[in-house]
């Protein structure tokens, strides 16, 4: 028996319906899985899971598993009540969907640096720093132009300033090696002075502000970030009450910030003078608050997190990698040369460069990216597509995106030569998936995008750290204890360069 004739109109409608369920790339469009639960109570429960009962990575992995491997999910993000008015986000947990957050035409990043809450502007002299401005804001380009010009003009000071900081830091490590020596504390102490020397020159804050300069800087950072900090206060119920329930009052760090600001007003006077002559349209006091933020939050805060992670991975890799790095460094800059390691020299060290990029892939200094959808859009993961509505908060957890097994072989492992052409696990084309700087490593920051204006300086400091370490030492050993934000690294032995 012949089948009934098909009405051409019905067939066309069916075909149109099928097409409407596919994304432009041909992926099936699905409803975003997950949910937000009961207002107040579910965000509170999720906050406890995130900080204490599961930890950040397991918080996301467990929800991915719960929803059949979907990597675009609806979840609550801390801090939740009472600091955050709306904890609801659409989480992007794979390399493909995450890239939406790097497209400034698709996301609005005004006031999203820290996520679902905005620190009080009283912490920033009443101003909104560059990092909290959307790329479309006219002030963004004006301020970023000054910051990028500063970073470019001071790049030739980075290597000598770092060399001095490294020597002082590791002289202190060696002096304390009768017992275990914690790297993190020394790193904080010397990297604040390095940051200011590299960016502005002049007397370091440890001399002008005094020994309390680092303490004041850390207190100012803590008052911004305490809603998303954890395992700082024990027991955890007390931490919940003190750090995650209400915003700490800015007046408690007003005096310390005033001392730091006074230091930068003098140290950065030439930069501020030049900006005024260039008629940037940004008042001097506002630009000063921005320079304080760039130096302490972006630069010093980044080095505080990033360098312990580099040392962690080197410590775990052991003597075999150490020997390869020492050979490469000393072949490029012999230990007897007085000029020291330059940026041009580390550019000729492919393994050193790869180690730094791999550390940035495994542990990006800023783990999160946030942005509001500028319009209704379709977000694609590897396997499906999802409709997002205008105004929804998009969130990316970068450690999952940059360890995506569909992009990287041995994605969860530290592979030292991953970015060496012809290396064991790949080569340079993978760099576009290293996105720690709020943009691909293959792209440059500009006035019109949200990529880190100090991207090149951060990478340079990482390379100098590795190169200086293996110019001075053959190998080292250290204990590593994982902790939120950064690992605690304790040196137990250092073996001086045999040819030194």
Curated annotation (Swiss-Prot):
Tissue specificity remark: Not expressed in dark-grown seedlings.
Superkingdom in the source lineage: Eukaryota
Gene Ontology biological-process annotations: fatty acid biosynthetic process; oxylipin biosynthetic process
Inducers of expression: Not induced by red (R) light, or abrasion in dark-grown seedlings.
GO molecular function, one term: oxidoreductase activity, acting on paired donors, with incorporation or reduction of molecular oxygen
Reaction(s) this enzyme catalyzes, per UniProt: (13S)-hydroperoxy-(9Z,11E,15Z)-octadecatrienoate = (9Z,13S,15Z)-12,13-epoxyoctadeca-9,11,15-trienoate + H2O
EC number, UniProt record: 4.2.1.92
Binding site for heme: 452
Pfam families: p450
Chain segments carrying region Disordered: 1-26
Keywords attached to this entry: Fatty acid biosynthesis, Fatty acid metabolism, Heme, Iron, Lipid biosynthesis, Lipid metabolism, Lyase, Metal-binding, Oxylipin biosynthesis
Homology family: Belongs to the cytochrome P450 family.
Protein name: Allene oxide synthase 3
Organism: Oryza sativa subsp. japonica (Rice)
């Amino acid at each position: 028996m012949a089948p009934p004739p098909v009405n051409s109109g019905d067939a066309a409608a069916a075909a149109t319906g099928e097409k409407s369920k596919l994304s432009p790339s041909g992926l099936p469009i699905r409803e975003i899985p997950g949910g937000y639960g009961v207002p107040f109570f579910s965000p509170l429960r999720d906050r406890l899971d995130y900080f204490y009962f599961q930890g950040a990575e397991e918080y996301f992995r467990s929800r991915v598993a719960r929803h059949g491997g979907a990597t675009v999910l609806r979840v609550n993000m801390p801090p939740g009540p009472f600091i955050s008015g709306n904890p609801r986000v659409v989480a992007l947990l794979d390399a493909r969907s995450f890239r939406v957050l790097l497209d400034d035409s698709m996301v609005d990043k005004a006031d999203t640096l820290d996520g679902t809450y905005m620190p009080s502007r009283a912490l920033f002299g009443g101003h909104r720093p560059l990092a909290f401005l959307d790329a479309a804001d006219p002030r963004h380009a004006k301020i970023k132009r000054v910051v990028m010009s500063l970073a470019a003009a001071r790049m030739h000071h980075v290597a000598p300033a770092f060399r001095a900081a490294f020597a002082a830091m590791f002289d202190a490590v060696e002096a304390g090696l009768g017992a275990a020596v914690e790297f993190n504390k020394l790193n904080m102490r010397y990297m604040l002075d390095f940051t200011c020397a590299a960016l502005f020159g002049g007397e370091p804050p440890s001399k002008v502000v005094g020994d309390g300069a680092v303490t004041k800087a850390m207190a100012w950072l803590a008052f911004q970030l305490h809603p998303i900090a954890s395992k700082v206060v024990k027991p955890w119920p007390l931490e919940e009450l003190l750090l995650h329930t209400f915003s700490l009052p800015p007046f408690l760090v007003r005096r310390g910030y005033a001392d730091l600001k006074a230091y930068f007003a003098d140290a950065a006077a030439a930069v501020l003078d030049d900006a005024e002559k260039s008629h940037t349209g940004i008042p001097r006091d506002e630009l000063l608050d921005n320079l304080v933020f760039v130096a302490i939050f972006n630069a010093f805060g980044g080095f505080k997190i990033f360098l312990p992670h580099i040392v962690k991975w080197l410590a775990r890799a052991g003597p075999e990698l150490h020997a390869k790095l020492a050979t490469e460094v000393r072949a490029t800059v012999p230990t007897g040369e007085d000029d020291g390691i330059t940026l041009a020299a580390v550019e000729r060290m492919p393994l050193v460069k790869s180690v730094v990029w791999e550390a940035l892939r495994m542990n990006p200094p800023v783990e999160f990216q946030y942005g509001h959808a500028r319009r209704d859009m379709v977000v694609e993961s590897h396997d499906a597509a999802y409709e997002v509505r205008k105004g929804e908060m998009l969130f990316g957890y970068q450690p999952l995106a940059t360890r995506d097994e569909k992009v990287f072989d041995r994605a969860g492992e530290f592979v030292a030569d991953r970015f060496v052409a012809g290396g064991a696990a790949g080569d340079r084309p993978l760099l576009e998936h290293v996105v720690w700087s709020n943009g691909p490593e293959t792209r440059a920051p500009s006035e019109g995008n949200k990529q880190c204006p100090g991207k090149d300086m951060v990478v340079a400091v990482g390379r100098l750290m590795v190169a200086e370490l293996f110019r001075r030492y053959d190998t080292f050993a250290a204990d590593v204890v994982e902790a939120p934000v950064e690992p605690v690294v304790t040196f137990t032995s250092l073996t001086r360069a045999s040819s030194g």
